[in-house]
């Protein structure tokens, strides 16, 4: 009996949320930084697949990736709703981790004007800015690769977008601003992730969904500023600022005790309202 239990446990990883990895044709990372950029593809069961795909850009301050919470758990949730999840391993700046971080100024949500052009990066420096650009190239390559495999993966080419968490939101925003037709997302969602560079809204900007917490310093103000940039350009944007609960947000138990735990349901409802899922 014990042998049977052990054998069944060995097969658990193979039957739970199987995924494939694909390397991206982008620049190799610097020595000591991250692994080669790649995507991990999590596909829903074919009988519930609705043709929508989301490239997940995990957070981690551009120094690590919050993979378990922002990709693995989120992919499982999305697959349950028939959505393909594409985890993105993008360029990082790991070599900066041992140098310490200067404490940035703390900007309250009531002062979005503190971030002209919605640039909420409190500590610009050459190496950090270049990493953001490299990560944005990875994100654009991810969208292109999903479109190339769209028929194989049962994905609609006009239903591929981003969901960025924290720094990953900044990566997704940067990618959206400089994308060509093949790289352009159909939608852009950022969860407590403001822009890390000056925002220039593209002429054909995708619909934007923003979620954040009111008392999140810098982030909330930066995201209000991002919303305003999108609206000033005449683009479609929706902003949700939660007043309670802890952030940043990952998938939460639905206890009914906070409003922040409803963000994942809000995401699904928004995708339905925009016609990306049935």
Summary of predicted features, one role per range:
Residues 1-21:
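Bacterial Sec-dependent N-terminal signal peptides
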Residues 26-54, 59-153:
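Serine-hydrolase catalytic machinery in alpha/beta-hydrolase-like enzymes
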Residues 37, 42, 236-278:
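C-terminal catalytic histidine-bearing segment of alpha/beta-hydrolase fold enzymes
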Residues 45, 60, 166, 214-216:
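Residue-level signal for short, function-critical loop segments
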Residues 53-57, 85-89, 159-164, 173, ...:
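Structural recognition of the beta-strand scaffold that forms the well-ordered cores
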Residues 74-82, 226-231, 271:
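Hydrophobic alpha-helical packing residues
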Residues 133-205:
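Primarily recognizes the serine-hydrolase "nucleophile elbow" in alpha/beta-hydrolase
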Residues 186-243:
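The feature captures the conserved acid-bearing segment of alpha/beta-hydrolase catalytic domains
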């Amino acid at each position: 009996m014990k042998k049977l239990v052990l054998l069944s446990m060995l097969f658990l990883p193979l039957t739970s949320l199987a995924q494939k990895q694909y390397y991206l044709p982008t620049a190799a990372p610097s020595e000591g930084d991250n692994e080669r950029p790649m995507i991990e593809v999590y596909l829903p069961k074919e009988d519930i697949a609705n043709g929508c795909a989301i490239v997940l850009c995990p957070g981690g301050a551009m120094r690590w990736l919050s993979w378990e919470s922002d990709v693995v758990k989120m992919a499982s949730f999305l697959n349950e709703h028939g959505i393909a999840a594409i985890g993105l391993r993008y360029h990082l700046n790991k070599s900066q981790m041992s140098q310490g971080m200067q404490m940035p100024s703390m900007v309250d949500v009531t002062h979005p004007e503190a971030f002209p052009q919605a640039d909420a990066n409190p500590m610009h420096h050459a190496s950090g800015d270049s990493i953001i650009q490299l990560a944005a190239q990875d994100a654009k390559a991810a969208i292109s690769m999903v479109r190339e495999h769209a028929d194989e993966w049962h994905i609609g080419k006009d239903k591929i977008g981003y969901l960025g968490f924290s720094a990953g939101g900044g990566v997704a925003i940067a990618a959206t601003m400089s994308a060509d037709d093949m790289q352009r997302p159909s939608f852009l969602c950022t969860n407590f992730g403001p822009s890390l560079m000056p925002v220039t809204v593209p002429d054909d900007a995708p619909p934007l969904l923003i979620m954040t917490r009111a008392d999140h310093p810098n982030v909330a103000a930066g995201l209000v500023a991002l919303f305003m940039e999108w609206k000033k350009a005449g683009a479609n944007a929706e902003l949700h600022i939660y007043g309670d609960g802890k952030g940043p947000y990952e998938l939460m138990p639905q206890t009914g005790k906070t409003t922040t735990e409803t963000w994942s349901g809000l995401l699904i409802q928004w995708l339905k309202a925009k016609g990306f899922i049935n």
